[in-house]
């Protein structure tokens, strides 16, 4: 992963907050699925297969398949890591998919599958890109290892608490995103997705600017 361009932790923390919003929307407004957190989605799929009330095999399956499609696309995007523009392009692709999701939520307010699919593709794409970047403790969609590291590497556990600030902020970022997403989705599905699109586009522009400044040094 050393050939990948540098990514600002601040940008990835913003993307982590976006994840919280997206999963709040998908779980609360699209039939109890996760389109970003595939660990949770697989668990929900298992519950649905066992006949748990309020869950759907088809919705969870669509989320999983869409995520895989996005991850394949993200893998293709990351094939050429000789420059740094591919990261911004990928983030702009994600922003476009989230904007599409917001539009679909307006056009098909009672049909969640299109929004599940578009947000799933967006999150799969993002995961493939962030995986290639390989920034420690900032996967942007999963916090299990981050929380484990925070505890297992703490002074209480005999460690020296490396990157505890980054780990803590990542947890807070996703928590804040989930809270904000919940507050917004009470009123409309499209608004939080539109906000996510704008934030992600801003992250793409910020990444372009940061790496442009680095090239000029």
PLM regions: where:
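Alpha-helical transmembrane segments of multi-pass membrane proteins
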Residues: 1-217
């Amino acid at each position: 992963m050393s050939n990948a361009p540098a990514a600002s932790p601040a940008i990835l923390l913003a993307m982590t907050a976006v994840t919280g919003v997206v999963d709040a929307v998908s779980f609360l407004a699209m039939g109890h699925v996760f389109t970003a957190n595939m660990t949770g989605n697989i668990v929900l799929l298992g519950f649905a297969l066992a006949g748990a009330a309020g869950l759907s095999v088809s919705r969870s399956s669509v989320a999983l398949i869409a995520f895989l499609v996005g991850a394949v696309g993200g893998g293709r995007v990351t094939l050429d890591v000789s420059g740094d523009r591919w990261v911004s392009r990928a983030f702009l692709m994600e922003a476009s998919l989230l904007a599409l999701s917001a539009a679909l939520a307006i056009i098909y307010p009672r049909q969640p599958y299109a929004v599940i699919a578009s947000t799933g593709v967006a999150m799969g794409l993002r995961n493939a890109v962030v995986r290639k970047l390989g920034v420690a403790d900032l996967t942007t969609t999963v916090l299990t290892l981050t929380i484990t590291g925070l505890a297992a590497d703490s002074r209480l556990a005999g460690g020296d608490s490396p990157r505890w600030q980054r780990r803590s902020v990542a947890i807070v970022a996703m928590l804040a995103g989930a809270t904000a997403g919940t507050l917004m989705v009470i009123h409309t599905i499209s608004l939080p997705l539109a906000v996510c699109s704008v934030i992600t586009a801003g992250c793409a522009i910020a990444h372009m600017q940061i790496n442009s400044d680095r090239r000029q040094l």
